[in-house]
Amino acid sequence: MGTYTLECAGCRHTIPDNYTLRCECGAGLIRARYTARQISPRDLPGMWRYYDWLPTRGHLDTPGAPVTFKSQGLSKELGLKELYISFNGYWPEMGARMDTCSFKELEAPPTIVRAREHGGRAMVLASVGNTARAFAYLSTLTGFPVVIVVPRKSAHNLWIPGREPGDSIKLITMEEGNDYSDAIRLSERIAGIEGVMPEGGARNVARRDGMGVTMLDAAVTMKRMPDDYFQAIGSGTGGIAAWEAALRLRDDGRFGDRLPKLHLAQNLPFAPMYYAWKAGRRDIIPELDMPEAKKQIEAMYTDILSNRNPPYGVTGGVYDALIDTQGDMYAVTNDEAIRAKRIFEKAEGIDILPPAAVAVAALLQACDRGLEKKRTVLLNITGGGLERLRKEVSMSMVKPCLNVEGPEVPLENITKAIQWQTLSKKS
């Protein structure tokens, strides 16, 4: 059993875990402190190999896990001799079976298990695509009820691989003009309904430590931590997760004593964390860093990488992760991402999702700026294999139970649409 305590990154106090998402001090993110100082992979399915560093008592029989391998094609293209790829998606011959084609499939299992273990009857979350798909898939597999809120333009991302969507999924779409932050606002209101538990976003240790499995798997495979870690970010939760996993690996003592340098990328024109970081600021100033946020988001290559309220300046957040790892941020244009996608797919022989292409573009920028060829680099391909999956696996769309104009919709409309009495009795 992966035993742990919770500690606030702000006040450093130990906190009891009652599916706790916030410390009373309000100063920082909560972290899990695990009893197991060293990671010992278990004989368990998928990501649960790293059970000792996941904040749950039980586990699920889910096969999804990252696959880490040494690049041949892209490494030759870039002249990087020690380039490793963490592939999160569908690529059967490589052993990759994240059938939702996104590393968000690492978030959902421990989050749902943690919620169940703390008496959760249902969960609500907001998303613009990959997170929603992962939780919908896990809801279908487990029967655990989820209420998912997405902008209607993102509803095409809600499909279930290999089976029909479960009745446990209640999808609410929002009219045109609403974005991820509007979906978050509505989900926060829905979490006020009795019996509905908030998913928690970046504040949920299960979500972060689930994504941290990417770094754990890479270190175990490589027998060391990388020198450099590249990932595209929207909220930055994945970057925080990589940093926290690296801190544990450093304390483990077998994978090196230097933290990987984080290279985190945003997709222009919406890149508030990039602008704040380059200005040397801990805080995002909306009028400077995202002056026309909704218009900027509409112009992105991948609006999955958008969040108007990211955990950037909070203690234990993205800013601290970059400072602690001597990291850097990148701004990637749409054309750069499209070009990077073509380069990767030709070099490695598998399709990748747009957010992963942004990470590849950041790596190309770093190489152009003189990234040392001898450094050990880990590139997180956060999603891929979708085109391959479409040819080999059936996909069923999740149908919405309600479409709303905005986040201030009367809650009685929500309660009626999700058939709350039925939903709350399932778990």
UniProtKB/Swiss-Prot annotation:
Cofactor annotation: pyridoxal 5'-phosphate
Pathway it works in: Cofactor biosynthesis; coenzyme M biosynthesis
Sequence positions that bind pyridoxal 5'-phosphate: N130, T382
Reactions performed catalytically: O-phospho-L-serine + sulfite + H(+) = L-cysteate + phosphate
GO molecular function terms listed in the Swiss-Prot or TrEMBL record: ATP binding; cysteate synthase activity; L-serine ammonia-lyase activity; magnesium ion binding; pyridoxal phosphate binding; serine racemase activity; threonine racemase activity
Keyword tags: Coenzyme M biosynthesis, Pyridoxal phosphate, Transferase
Domain of life: Archaea
N6-(pyridoxal phosphate)lysine found at: K104
SUPFAM superfamilies: Tryptophan synthase beta subunit-like PLP-dependent enzymes
EC category name: transferase
The EC number(s) this enzyme carries: 2.5.1.76
TM annotation in the entry: none
Keyword Disulfide bond part of the UniProt annotation: no
One of the protein's GO biological processes: D-serine biosynthetic process
Known partners and oligomeric status: Homotrimer.
Family: Belongs to the threonine synthase family. Cysteate synthase subfamily.
Function, as annotated: Specifically catalyzes the beta-elimination of phosphate from L-phosphoserine and the beta-addition of sulfite to the dehydroalanine intermediate to produce L-cysteate.
Protein name as annotated: Cysteate synthase
Organism per entry: Methanocella paludicola (strain DSM 17711 / JCM 13418 / NBRC 101707 / SANAE)
